[in-house]
């Protein structure tokens, strides 16, 4: 089982990908960990380095889950024919999820540091619907529409505990 999860910040990517990885015992790659310099906030690595790390992860494992908001990197993962899950729950749900987000220790040294970035994050989430590019609704829709493999667009929060029949069908 290979799964790629794509969506806006706050769409539920990390929650769903983490659940799938746990349920299937598959390794999980959060694309933020290959895009950004370790231990540095908003210091990007080269796109080539990120793609190289993603290829290394995908080619080394039979089963995996990757998640992120980077359409170009998801496109790279799609070369390995995963199920593509595009989370598109709408701006209100993404904002609500961001406000309720637990501390992301892999991104921030403290909860306080993360909270200092919340206003910027909420603005980023809202701009998703009007900007263009790799991390926009337009970019995500283009990635989703171009993929000819198994895929699903999810517009409501999936039921994970216990998993709904719909969620289990994505994994079969």
Describe each model-derived feature in a short phrase.
Residues 23, 127-172:
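NTP-dependent small-molecule kinase module
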């Amino acid at each position: 089982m290979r799964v790629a999860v794509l969506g806006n910040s706050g769409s539920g990517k990390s929650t769903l990908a983490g659940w799938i990885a746990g349920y299937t015992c598959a390794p999980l790659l959060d694309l933020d960990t290959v895009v950004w310099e370790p231990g540095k906030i908003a210091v990007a690595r080269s796109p080539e380095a990120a793609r190289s790390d993603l290829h290394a992860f995908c080619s080394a494992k039979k089963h995996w889950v990757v998640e992120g908001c980077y359409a170009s990197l998801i496109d790279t993962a799609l070369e390995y024919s995963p199920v593509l899950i595009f989370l598109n729950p709408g701006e209100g749900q993404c904002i609500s999820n961001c406000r309720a987000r637990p501390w992301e220790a892999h991104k921030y040294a403290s909860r306080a540091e993360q909270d200092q970035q919340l206003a910027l994050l909420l603005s980023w989430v809202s701009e998703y619907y009007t900007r263009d590019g790799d991390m926009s609704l337009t970019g995500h829709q283009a990635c989703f529409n171009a993929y000819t493999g198994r895929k699903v667009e999810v517009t409501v929060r999936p039921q994970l505990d216990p998993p709904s029949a719909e969620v289990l069908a994505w994994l079969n």
